[in-house]
A protein has these predicted regions:
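Beta-propeller fold detector
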Residues: 1-2, 47-56, 103-110, 151-159
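Beta-rich, blade/repeat-based domains predominating
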Residues: 3-24, 55-78, 112-127, 159-180
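Conserved beta-strand positions in repeat-built beta-propeller and related beta-rich domains
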Residues: 15, 22, 27-30, 75, ...
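Flexible glycine-/small-residue-enriched beta->alpha junction loops
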Residues: 28-60
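Structural signal for beta-propeller blades
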Residues: 32-36, 89-91, 138-140, 191-193
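Short loop/turn segments immediately following beta-strands, especially the blade-tip
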Residues: 37-47, 94-102, 143-151
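Loop-centered beta-sheet repeat module
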Residues: 81-138
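A beta-strand-loop signature enriched in Asp, Gly, Thr, and Trp
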Residues: 142-194
Length: 194
């Protein structure tokens, strides 16, 4: 099914369950700095029931002039929604009401290095490690994770930056293989898969 939400530019979405149990889809709108909630009834998208507008800006006056949410998901051990925001250098957390209302968790925010431009956060299968892909500085931050507590344990460059310091490159995507033994990253500009 299809739902029209005029003027929206959704770049990523997730549901609050599998195809049998989900009753909501959560979408991030990159250009309008919003998170939208769409209801599902009998496995069909029905209508947009809620919006939440992010505010602020980041270090880079061009690429971070406003919030740019890029990824949405659920924490592995909580019923909290998380939104990765390239424009704010943050991962924000939300409580979701039965009616789809989103409430920003003002206590828990994962603040990243200014100007790094996070684009995606994924978890290993055990749910005890979080991997944040930073588009603007081409790094991956690895966190030990436990119930809304994130402890940075490693930051990795996604390509050898010393080889060509003038190269303009950005990290495009990260993904685990099927058993979590390898994390793959794609670089635009450096044009590499690592």
């Amino acid at each position: 099914s299809r739902v029209t939400d005029k003027g929206k530019t959704y770049v990523h979405a997730c549901a609050n369950g599998d195809v049998e149990t989900a009753d909501k889809v959560f979408c991030v709108d990159y250009f309008n700095s919003e998170i939208s909630v769409i209801s599902i009834v009998k496995k069909k998208l029905v209508k947009c029931i809620s919006h939440f507008k992010l505010n602020g800006s980041g270090k880079d006056p061009v690429k971070q002039a406003q919030p740019y949410p890029t990824y949405v998901g659920f924490l592995p051990d909580e019923d909290k929604l998380y939104v990765v925001c390239l424009g704010l250098d943050q991962v924000c957390f939300f409580d979701v009401g039965e009616d789809g209302t989103l409430t920003l968790d003002n206590v828990h925010t994962l603040q990243l290095e200014p100007g790094c431009g996070p684009k995606k956060m994924i978890f290993n299968q055990k749910g005890d490690r979080a991997y944040v892909m930073n588009e603007l500085n081409s790094t991956i931050c690895v966190y030990k994770y436990d119930h809304l507590n994130f402890e940075l344990i490693q930051t990795i460059d996604s390509y050898p930056k010393d080889d060509d310091p003038e190269l303009v490159s950005s990290l495009s995507d990260i993904k685990f293989n099927s058993d979590d033994s390898h994390l793959y990253a794609i670089n635009k500009g450096h044009d590499s898969l690592v």
